Amino acid sequence: MLLEFTKMHGLGNDFVVLDLISQRAYLDTTTIQRMADRHFGIGFDQLLIVEPPDYPNVDFKYRIFNADGSEVEQCGNGVRCFARFVHERQLTKKTKIKVQTKAGIVEPELGPNGWVRVNMGYPKFMPHEIPFVTEEFEALYTLELANEQSLKIDVVNMGNPHAVTIVPDVLTADVATMGPQVESHVRFPQRVNAGFMQIVDEKHIRLRVFERGVGETLACGTGACAAAVSGMRRGLLANEVEVELAGGKLQIAWQEGDVVWMTGPTANVYEGRLDLRYFQS
């Protein structure tokens, strides 16, 4: 069985996008893992699936699978690519759409030259909303790591869980060691995305993210939102900031009590057809 797909990326955070409105397929965990293999498959950070919505006032259903085959609630870079994909594939003529995710409704809006602005919804901070295990709510939490190390973290849910820590320099931060420990820490029962943020000034941060189920990626849209919101609510950042990631830059805006806005680019890489029998054999 041949499936048409599109390879896209948002700041190097790369995706395979499948239209499962015009075509049909069943993809189990093993199949997705094989597709994600960068040597024997296509290779991607996440698989994005376009499906019909479950509700009449929504345009599309958006499903996201990590490279390890796990389904997740949200992907910020992915939703920008999703919006461009459905418009260019003529699945909709709208430039502003409502998209159903496991975390709720997001509203991307197409701009010029492949840029997309997205209403990412309201950030959540309560421990049970992350979820994060703690005896009481605090502004910052101490997370114990191996070898008697610890990190001061903030926790934010942007449709998916994030732990944010401030570092002096993202280039020298030991993301490879600390990232996996934070991601799978026992206090995060659903695992977590680990963000390492350097504050350059009140309108500019640098960020590295070790993503749950993927590892460190070149960019993470929800991670950029979580880091910016964390700094803003602590009075360390202005209400609009530029987030510099390895793959490029995002603009994040937020006012206390309001939704988070993310603006950034998208790119089409190539289109192709995959033989599903190869990945399921």
Swiss-Prot record:
The keyword Isomerase applies. GO terms for biological process: lysine biosynthetic process via diaminopimelate. Substrate binds at residues 13, 46, 66, 76-77, 160, 193, 211-212, 221-222. Keywords: Amino-acid biosynthesis, Cytoplasm, Isomerase, Lysine biosynthesis. Its main location: cytoplasm. It is found in: Cytoplasm. The record marks 162, 211 as: Could be important to modulate the pK values of the two catalytic cysteine residues. One of its GO terms (cellular component) is cytosol. The keyword Membrane does not apply. InterPro entries: DAP_epimerase_AS (IPR018510), DAP_epimerase_DapF (IPR001653). It catalyses: (2S,6S)-2,6-diaminopimelate = meso-2,6-diaminopimelate. The record marks 270 as: Important for dimerization. The active site is at 75 (proton donor), 220 (proton acceptor). One of its GO terms (molecular function) is diaminopimelate epimerase activity. Catalyzes the stereoinversion of LL-2,6-diaminopimelate (L,L-DAP) to meso-diaminopimelate (meso-DAP), a precursor of L-lysine and an essential component of the bacterial peptidoglycan. PANTHER family: DIAMINOPIMELATE EPIMERASE (PTHR31689:SF0), DIAMINOPIMELATE EPIMERASE, CHLOROPLASTIC (PTHR31689). Homodimer. Belongs to the diaminopimelate epimerase family. This is Diaminopimelate epimerase. It comes from Acinetobacter baylyi (strain ATCC 33305 / BD413 / ADP1).
